[in-house]
UniProtKB/Swiss-Prot annotation:
Biological process, per Gene Ontology: adaptive immune response; response to bacterium
Protein name: T cell receptor alpha variable 4
Signal sequence extent: 1-19
Organism: Homo sapiens
Protein origin, superkingdom: Eukaryota
Amino acid sequence: MRQVARVIVFLTLSTLSLAKTTQPISMDSYEGQEVNITCSHNNIATNDYITWYQQFPSQGPRFIIQGYKTKVTNEVASLFIPADRKSSTLSLPRVSLSDTAVYYCLVGD
């Protein structure tokens, strides 16, 4: 039987800059699948970086990945940023139940 992992994403307003970020409220996935979470940030400044965090219940946010343009990959995730930088996509490969968390997209320098 395949387990369902729930990835919860909240709308956040970055305190690091004036760019407003918009994300989906929640999404479901089966274990072992790739999950892609898109964040819109239409009024991003030229020098702003895009940073993603993961937060588990009763814990503080944990840094996942940060990027400025194109594609960034680390051992946890990949971050895709198109040329216009008005959105970004966090890609989590092969999710499991332990990935159930709140994911935040923040924009700032």
